[in-house]
């Protein structure tokens, strides 16, 4: 922890990792309203408290068709100004490695109703509003990484009652014709609906009208990447 007469921040983390099959962690952190966010080297709001816990079960010894597997559950909570709950998320992640070195996994999370206070930093007359419950379920699969040609797929769907459904999909091809050279081609599509996005505040005489709107962000991306290692000290990327 670090503190001074002007501002203070606290961060604690405690955990245990069993060498064979399980591990757990707990963390708690806080910034007061005088904490200088520039002290961290990047933009992060102050006057915030967060905590969470994680529990993971893993198997690293081969059995049957499996070389290894893992199951992790995690809980995150954040509180903002006046101890308002601004994040309440529960997530689950799994992965499995097969004997043919293909691997696959599942990831799922649910954001339970909390509050969003980000708009009051833009305008003092904006609202702190209640967020809706949102869930996301996804899966991924990746072929043998020892091969010259590696295929991977990542996809998922999220949903909330008011904002509706969103989708994510990604397909990637990695090709390694020779050891120093790696080529990668990635196709990605992301459809993300947003709810209660702040627009503006209109003053009409003595009346204040707060304008919010739904929106939907669609991202289509194709990316080609090249990595060529000439020596341990010289690499070309493009």
Where does each model-flagged region fall?
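Extracellular loop and loop/strand-boundary signature of outer-membrane beta-barrel proteins
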Residues: 38-43, 78-79, 123-127, 156-159, ...
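Single conserved hydrophobic/aromatic residue that forms the stacking wall/gate
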Residues: 1-7, 11
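Residues on the lipid-exposed face of transmembrane beta-strands in outer-membrane beta-barrel proteins
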Residues: 13-17, 53-57, 92-96, 139-143, ...
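Flexible, solvent-exposed coil segments and beta strand-coil junctions
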Residues: 30-37, 69-75, 116-121, 147-153, ...
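Residues that define the transmembrane beta-barrel architecture of outer-membrane proteins
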Residues: 9, 47-51, 86-90, 133-137, ...
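Repeated loop/turn-to-beta-strand initiation elements of outer-membrane beta-barrel proteins
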Residues: 20-26, 62-66, 100-106, 147-153, ...
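Outer-membrane beta-barrel translocator domains and adjoining extracellular loop/strand segments
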Residues: 8, 36-42, 82-88, 116-125, ...
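Transmembrane beta-strands of outer-membrane beta-barrel pores
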Residues: 28-34, 57-59, 73-81, 108-114, ...
């Amino acid at each position: 922890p670090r503190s001074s007469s002007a501002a203070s921040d606290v961060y604690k983390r405690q955990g245990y990792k069993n060498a064979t099959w399980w591990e757990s962690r707990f963390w708690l952190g806080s910034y007061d309203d005088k904490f200088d966010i520039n002290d961290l080297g990047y933009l992060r709001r102050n006057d915030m408290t967060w905590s969470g816990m994680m529990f993971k079960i893993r198997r690293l010894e081969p059995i049957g068709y499996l070389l290894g597997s893992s199951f992790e559950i995690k809980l995150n909570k954040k509180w903002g100004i006046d101890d308002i709950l601004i994040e309440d998320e529960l997530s689950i992640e799994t992965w499995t490695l097969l004997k043919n070195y293909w691997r696959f996994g599942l990831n799922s999370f649910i954001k339970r109703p909390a509050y969003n206070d980000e708009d009051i930093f833009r305008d003092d007359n904006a609202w702190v509003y209640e967020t809706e419950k949102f869930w996301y379920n996804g899966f991924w699969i990746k072929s043998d990484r020892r091969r010259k040609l590696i295929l991977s797929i990542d996809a998922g769907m999220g949903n909330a009652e008011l904002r509706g459904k969103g989708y994510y999909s990604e397909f990637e091809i990695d090709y390694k014709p020779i050891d120093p050279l790696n080529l990668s081609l990635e196709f990605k599509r992301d459809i993300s609906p947003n709810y209660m996005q702040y627009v503006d505040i209109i003053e009409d005489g003595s009346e204040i009208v707060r304008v919010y709107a739904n929106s939907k962000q669609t991202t289509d991306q194709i990316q080609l990447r090249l990595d060529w290692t000439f020596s341990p000290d010289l690499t070309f990327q493009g």
